[in-house]
UniProtKB/Swiss-Prot annotation:
It holds the Pfam family Intron_maturas2. This is Maturase K. Belongs to the intron maturase 2 family. MatK subfamily. The gene is matK. It is found in: Plastid, Chloroplast. GO terms for cellular component: chloroplast. Its main location: plastid. Usually encoded in the trnK tRNA gene intron. Probably assists in splicing its own and other chloroplast group II introns. InterPro entries: Domain_X, Maturase_MatK, Maturase_MatK_N. Keywords: Chloroplast, mRNA processing, Plastid, RNA-binding, tRNA processing. Signal peptide: none annotated. One of its GO terms (molecular function) is RNA binding. One of its GO terms (biological process) is mRNA processing.
Length: 522
């Protein structure tokens, strides 16, 4: 990393670092390995072909030599008919996958460099303290609770995916002016597509690319979502003379590299909360957050204006993707709903804004009046059906929610099995601590607890009842003790608390920057 910083300092006379020569440096690939790929870059190919971990570095050096002969190298990597590396066809495919993966992850490291430097300089310039708290997923919900209470209509939209790879590269031209690097990326993507055309259909090509080159794909996809965000904010500015009032404090959350910091489940969520043209101020808010594994980005558009205003914005979205991104998007996929009678799924919660009516009798001297008042309350509820679906896919229960054993965990030790189930319970409790109603969360905990008991009983070839009788309350304490200890520091001592979490307080944490797979149903 010191060598990399030294190169960038020497190149500081340029407007932007020239990144292409770094593809020929071994420490770039070592840096990619050290930044959390869990050895997939070096060790997985070594296991497949019988090499030890040290000899994988020799493959990296061979890769660098091949990059000097760009056309021959990429053709050899991605054309299974040319056999320049090894003589056997299957080994050629394996080496091709290894080399393409190294290029992909090495390139992803390079393109993150300018955004990393820009992020550091921005924070130093603005002197923003504790910016990591602003990137917490839970920090979004208090904002929604504050703003949505005054609005009428909402549209929850999925940014269309996928778009053509060339469009993604064109978007990068606005961020990176290194022409050789962009040409190399485009050539690499074309060769990758041609190679996979022998194995898969064109429709599945981008899906396979996203699975095999996760870091690079997420970088390209986040650049696309960031471009959508920039254009939407620009359109909103052009449509109204009203200035942004609450946009400034969250400006650093729109920074591109912030969206890239946690790449395992990292995607952008753009929330645009606006009013009618002549009825008040405009709020615009963007946050980096974890999204579904299917790489879906959500746009929440809410308005205090009329249904016609929302309909105009609906067609703005359609025209934006059709004419700017060359992506055909059906207008019927965007639904406009009233906030008072609509629940939308957002970041692992079912959010709604129900109306509560109450009657108050007012006595003034000899006259009495009956006043009907209507209040709104922002509610966030655990999506039980979605979570049960996720548990069913993970083989913890049936589709109807009946707990079953986890056979693949039966070979683990008892303590490891209990620890894994307990960790899942604690993670779900931690994330869904902001739920208005805890009954759904208790049901999910019950499913996991009984699934744990069935797994242990299966391992010891016993019945669940016999095993629980022998185990006693130890299993229950494993699932709830840690949650009780955490909440005891947060809730006042006067609030009663039991193992079953009977409290109704909503708690939002500032340390949640990604969503567990089971939180998302997709």
């Amino acid at each position: 990393m010191e060598e990399l910083q030294g190169y960038l300092e020497k190149d500081g006379s340029r407007q932007q670092p020239f990144l292409y020569p770094l593809l020929f440096q071994e420490y770039i690939y070592a840096l990619a390995h050290d930044r959390g790929f869990k050895g997939s870059l070096f060790y997985e190919p070594a296991e497949v072909f019988g090499y030890d971990s040290k000899s994988s570095l020799a493959l990296v050096k061979r890769l660098i030599i091949r990059i000097y002969q760009q056309n021959d190298f990429l053709s050899a990597v991605h054309d299974s008919n040319k056999n320049q590396f090894v003589s056997h066809h299957h080994k050629n495919l394996g080496y091709s996958h290894f080399y393409s993966q190294m290029i992909s992850e090495g390139f992803a490291i390079l393109v993150e460099i300018p955004f990393s430097l820009r992020l550091v300089s921005y924070f130093e310039k603005k002197e923003i303290p504790k910016s990591h708290n602003l990137r917490s997923i839970h920090s979004i919900f208090p904002f929604l609770e504050d703003k949505l209470l005054h609005l009428n209509y909402v549209s929850d939209i999925l940014i269309p995916h996928p778009i053509h790879m060339e469009i993604l590269v064109q978007i990068l031209q606005c961020w990176i002016q290194d022409v050789p690097l962009l040409h190399f990326l485009l050539f690499f993507l074309h060769k990758y597509h041609n190679w996979n055309s022998f194995l898969i259909t064109p429709k599945k090509s981008i899906y396979v690319f996203s699975k095999e080159n996760k870091r690079l794909f997420r970088f390209l996809y986040n650049s696309y979502v960031s471009e959508c965000e920039f254009l939407l904010v620009f359109l909103r500015k052009q449509s109204s003379y009203l200035r942004l009032t609450s946009f400034g404090p969250f400006l650093e959350r729109r920074h591109f590299y912030v969206k890239m910091e946690h790449l395992q489940m990292q995607h952008l969520i753009l929330i645009v909360v606006c009013r009618d043209y002549f009825q008040g101020t405009l709020w615009s808010y963007x946050x980096x957050x974890x999204x579904x594994x299917x790489x879906x980005x959500x746009v929440i558009l809410a308005s205090k204006g009329t249904h016609l205003l929302m309909k105009k914005w609906k067609y703005n979205f359609v025209n934006l993707w059709q004419y700017y991104f060359h992506f055909w998007y059906q207008s019927y996929r965007i639904h406009i709903n009233q906030l008072s009678n609509h629940s939308f799924y957002f970041l692992g919660y079912l959010s709604s804004l129900p109306r509560n009516s109450s009657t108050v009798r007012n006595q003034m001297l000899e006259n009495s009046f009956i006043i009907d008042t209507v209040t709104k309350k922002f509610e966030t509820i655990v999506p039980v059906i979605f979570l049960i679906g996720s548990l069913s896919k993970a083989q913890f229960c049936t589709v109807s929610g009946h707990p079953i054993s986890k056979p693949i965990w039966a070979d683990l030790s008892d303590s490891e099995i209990i620890e894994r189930f307990g960790r899942m319970c604690r993670n779900l409790s931690h994330y869904h601590s902001g739920s208005s109603k805890k009954q759904g969360l208790h049901r999910i905990k019950y499913i996991l607890r009984l699934s744990c008991a069935r797994t242990l009983a299966r391992k010891h070839k016993s019945t669940v009842r016999t095993f629980l009788r022998r185990l006693g309350s130890g299993l229950l304490e494993e699932f709830f003790t840690e949650e009780e200890q955490v909440l005891s520091f947060i809730l006042p001592k006067t609030i009663p608390f039991t193992f079953y979490g009977s409290h109704k307080e909503r708690i939002w944490y500032l340390d949640i920057i990604r969503i567990n797979d089971l939180v998302n149903h997709s």
